Amino acid sequence: MQREPPKRKQEKKVEKGLFDATSFGKDLLAGGVAAAVSKTTVAPIERVKLLLQVQASSKQISPEAQYKGIVDCLVRIPREQGFLSYWRGNLANVIRYFPTQALNFAFKDKYKQLFMSGVNKEKQFWRWFLANLASGGAAGATSLCVVYPLDFARTRLGADIGKGPEERQFKGLGDCIMKIAKSDGIVGLYQGFGVSVQGIIVYRASYFGAYDTVKGLLPKPKETHFLVSFFIAQVVTTCSGILSYPFDTVRRRMMMQSGEAERQYKGTLDCFMKIYQQEGIGAFFRGAFSNILRGTGGALVLVLYDKIKDLLNIDIGGSSSGD
């Protein structure tokens, strides 16, 4: 009987450790702010990458008018659509990216608590490493289920090359979602979702898992110099982006079909096969170099996230710093 109070107190502490609303909210804020800042910075590169990926499936871009590469795309966008068109779809992208990245980071830490409970890094290194991979992949897949319609709309808005309102396919985020939902139903907003889940797990598993693992091996992760953290994050985002890029290309091609009377691809597998047969393996990586440049923004997100969490004094037992 005398040991009852301490036991209840311990159970209460464990329960709080599994979900702390305050730290969870701060985690969302830290990840969201970092994501919004970096995404706005690399928006022009983001749009170039997107156009290079989907131009072969776009009804607005004829074969002879397709962009020849990154430089050609960068030069023609302001000339044909206006300078501000570099940021076309950026507002939708920020709206999408804020909850996406914030949920990724927040859930990742919660998944780490579940996957890594009782795991000793020194004695069970590979189990610890796999737990990092699993937490990153699970976080990405979970958040994708919530924000996929926004990602879909952002893709369609970014791929819209009309110069004036009368030439544009969609007037904005709301118009895009309403038109697709009206023509194809809610299912139309989830076109390419299956391959997206596959790609996001591959990307997030390496993105979060490798970053946490490398930082966790440093003597004092909390005291790591900003440039060292940025270099680690840059390598991680570059490798993760290249590894998952074919999945990203296919999912965006599938997104371009919603609302169209004629479908170019019957499904994900058919899309993979036709791209390979008709355009070659290089088509899967079209715009990949711009994606590497864009990855600088992703690396900045990881580093800013750690710094913002430090400023907010967040300590939830499993941060991106690899504590």
Curated annotation (Swiss-Prot):
A motif (Nucleotide carrier signature motif) lies at residues 251-256. One of its GO terms (cellular component) is mitochondrial permeability transition pore complex. Its main location: mitochondrion. The chain crosses the membrane at residues 24-53, 91-115, 126-146, 195-215, 227-247, 288-305. Coiled coil: none annotated. It holds the Pfam family Mito_carr. It is a multi-pass membrane protein. One of its GO terms (biological process) is negative regulation of mitochondrial outer membrane permeabilization involved in apoptotic signaling pathway. Keywords: Antiport, Cell membrane, Cell projection, Cilium, Differentiation, Flagellum, Membrane, Mitochondrion, Mitochondrion inner membrane, Repeat, Spermatogenesis, Transmembrane, Transmembrane helix, Transport. ADP:ATP antiporter that mediates import of ADP into the mitochondrial matrix for ATP synthesis, and export of ATP out to fuel the cell. Cycles between the cytoplasmic-open state (c-state) and the matrix-open state (m-state): operates by the alternating access mechanism with a single substrate-binding site intermittently exposed to either the cytosolic (c-state) or matrix (m-state) side of the inner mitochondrial membrane. Specifically required during spermatogenesis, probably to mediate ADP:ATP exchange in spermatocytes. This is ADP/ATP translocase 4.
